[in-house]
């Protein structure tokens, strides 16, 4: 790239994009960038170069290795406990892999994204928080997608807020990328945010030269328990496989999901997923309606539709959670495990998970054995830091 500005320009732009309410004097103090006048000059240069618009963006022609190194420096400056929390999360992932026979690859990378505060019941502030998170996470997600030749993507408001803010006309090196949905859609509920097929379409449009995105619009997300129990011949699953796109993605063996380089997903916990109205998770409610009323209480939450059983369940209750997953028609636990095991290899980011709300701390800690990259809000990072590093962490 030509005319690379110094680190101070990037740092000033990063702080301003992360929290637009910060004054120039505050940025100078927090980032150790000098006086208000000095910060003003740095921000002016960042705007002139196009690195600071509505959100922080790296130069489009910055080499990937240089961008990753700079991203790391900026994040360590912005969130002071970043290195300690990342190390604690990695240790937690290793512990899970040792204690769970179905464990995947250890966690590799944490990104903490600036997000405005909000309070329960203030829906406007919550929308603003999700929007800011998505705007600030988009550049990080795009960097990982740049590396991958294929990407399976999930659903929801966090995914929506992020993929909508990825700048368009990104040009992948080599053959076009393949984007695919992680699952079909609820039969009885409208998608809230984006569906997996919507998200795949948005991503394909952002990367010039990608293959036409695969779609499962109109295809079911799961087999209801009441249907499954009477379907001795597997007709319901065969009906889902009538879709050519479904077969291309999920055929066993040989489906694209078996060798996907990246899974981009949110994480759902039972508490926040139970909300109704604008905050509802239609995929949760579809599952709750299709299964026994109390069975989801046996799980701590889900990652991309795969439910994770609570610790300490007896064999019977654990089997109930496994059966819920068996009736899921999207990516399976083994698909997440396979993707996470290969994560970190060249061109394979693995499982990249997004989460905003502090209430999701428990499911994040339980799902780490399937996650390679975790992108979270500052508020959730603070909650995880208190859990893993001690009660006095701020």
Per-region residue spans from a language model:
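Helix-turn-helix/homeodomain-like alpha-helical modules used for DNA recognition
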Residues: 71-165, 370
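Nucleotide donor/acceptor-binding cores
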Residues: 148-149, 175-177, 349
């Amino acid at each position: 790239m030509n005319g690379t500005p110094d680190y101070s320009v990037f740092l000033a732009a990063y702080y301003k994009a992360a929290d637009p309410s910060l004054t120039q004097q505050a940025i100078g103090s927090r980032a150790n960038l000098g006086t208000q006048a000095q910060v003003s000059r740095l921000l002016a240069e960042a705007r002139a170069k196009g690195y600071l618009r509505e959100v922080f963006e790296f130069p489009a022609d910055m080499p990937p290795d240089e961008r990753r190194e700079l991203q790391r420096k900026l994040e360590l400056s912005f969130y002071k406990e970043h290195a300690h929390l990342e190390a604690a999360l990695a240790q937690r992932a290793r512990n899970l892999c040792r204690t769970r026979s179905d464990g995947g690859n250890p966690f590799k990378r944490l990104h903490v994204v600036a997000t405005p505060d909000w309070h329960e019941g203030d829906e406007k502030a919550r929308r603003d928080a999700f929007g800011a998170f998505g705007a600030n996470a988009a550049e990080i997600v795009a960097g990982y997608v740049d590396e991958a030749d294929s990407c399976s993507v999930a659903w929801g408001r966090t995914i929506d807020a992020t993929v909508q803010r990825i700048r368009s006309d990104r040009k992948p090196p080599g053959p076009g990328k393949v984007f695919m949905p992680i699952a079909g859609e609820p039969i009885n509920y409208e998608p809230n945010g984006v569906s997996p097929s919507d998200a795949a379409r948005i991503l394909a449009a952002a990367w010039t030269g990608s293959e036409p995105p695969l779609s499962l619009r109109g295809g079911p997300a799961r087999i209801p328990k009441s249907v499954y129990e009477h379907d001795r011949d597997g007709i319901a699953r065969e009906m889902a496989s009538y879709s050519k796109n479904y077969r291309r993605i999920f055929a066993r063996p040989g489906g694209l999901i078996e060798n996907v380089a990246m899974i981009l997903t949110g994480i759902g916990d039972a508490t926040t997923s139970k909300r109704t109205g604008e905050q509802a998770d239609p995929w949760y409610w579809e599952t709750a309606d299709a299964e026994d009323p109390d069975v989801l209480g046996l799980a701590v939450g889900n990652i991309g539709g795969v439910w994770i059983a609570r610790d300490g369940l007896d064999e019977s209750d654990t089997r109930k959670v496994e059966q819920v997953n068996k009736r899921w028609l999207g990516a399976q636990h083994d698909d997440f495990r396979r993707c996470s095991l290969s994560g970190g290899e060249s061109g394979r980011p693995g499982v990249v998970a997004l989460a905003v709300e502090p209430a999701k701390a428990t499911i994040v800690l339980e799902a780490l054995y399937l996650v390679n990259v975790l992108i979270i809000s500052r508020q959730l990072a603070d909650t995880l830091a208190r859990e893993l590093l001690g009660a006095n962490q701020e």
